[in-house]
From Swiss-Prot:
Signal peptide: none annotated. One of its GO terms (biological process) is regulation of translation. One of its GO terms (cellular component) is cytoplasm. Acts as an anti-CsrA protein, binds CsrA and prevents it from repressing translation of its target genes, one of which is flagellin. Binds to flagellin and participates in the assembly of the flagellum. It comes from Halalkalibacterium halodurans (strain ATCC BAA-125 / DSM 18197 / FERM 7344 / JCM 9153 / C-125) (Bacillus halodurans). The keyword Cytoplasm applies. Its main location: cytoplasm. The gene is fliW. It is found in: Cytoplasm. Interacts with translational regulator CsrA and flagellin(s). The keyword Oxidoreductase does not apply. This is Flagellar assembly factor FliW.
C-alpha cells in the first residue's frame, strides 16, 4: 500500500497495483510519472486522475464513449507497443475535462485521450494528430463538433 495525499479526497491508502505509470508524463507535466484513477464522486461518470507526487495535480476525466458513443480512437502501433497492449479489452480510454462555471458549459478534450493499459497499469496521453475531433467539445452537446476536416 502507498499513502498519497489527494486534491479532492484527502489522504488515501492506495494498493500498488492501482498505480498507473506514465513513463513520459503527460504533456506539460512530463515530470509526473505516476497517477492513480479514483472515482470523483460515487454514482457519477466522473473520475480523478490524481498524481501520486503532486497533491494539486488531479485531472477530472470521463469515459468519452458514455457521452459520445460515435467517438472513435485508433491506437497507433507505437502506442500499442509502448503500453504493451496485447488485448484490446485491457484498454481504457478517458478524456480530460475543462470544468467551467456553470458546469453545463464544461468541455472535454477529444483530441488527446488518456489511454490506459489496465492490465499492465501503464498509461499515456495520446495526441491524435490526424483527427477532426475538438479539444474543447462541449460535454453536454449531443453532436460532436468537428474542429477541422480529418486528413
Amino acid at each position: 500500500m502507498k499513502v498519497i495525499e489527494t486534491k479532492y479526497n484527502g489522504k488515501l491508502e492506495v494498493a500498488e497495483d492501482r498505480l498507473i505509470a506514465f513513463d513520459q508524463g503527460i504533456p506539460a507535466f512530463e515530470d509526473e510519472k505516476e497517477f492513480v484513477l479514483l472515482p470523483f464522486e460515487e454514482g457519477t461518470p466522473y473520475y480523478t486522475l490524481q498524481s501520486t507526487k503532486t497533491v494539486d495535480l488531479a485531472f477530472i476525466i470521463v469515459n468519452p464513449f458514455s457521452f459520445f458513443p460515435e467517438y472513435r480512437v485508433k491506437l497507433p502501433e507505437a502506442t500499442i507497443v509502448q503500453l504493451n497492449i496485447t488485448n484490446e479489452n485491457d484498454v481504457a480510454i478517458f478524456s480530460l475535462l475543462t470544468v467551467k462555471e456553470p458546469f453545463s458549459e464544461t468541455t472535454v478534450n477529444l483530441q488527446a485521450p488518456i489511454v490506459i493499459n489496465a492490465n499492465k497499469q501503464m498509461g499515456k496521453q495520446l495526441v491524435l494528430g490526424d483527427t477532426a475531433y475538438d479539444r474543447k467539445q462541449p460535454l453536454f452537446q449531443k453532436e460532436l463538433v468537428l474542429a477541422k476536416e480529418a486528413k
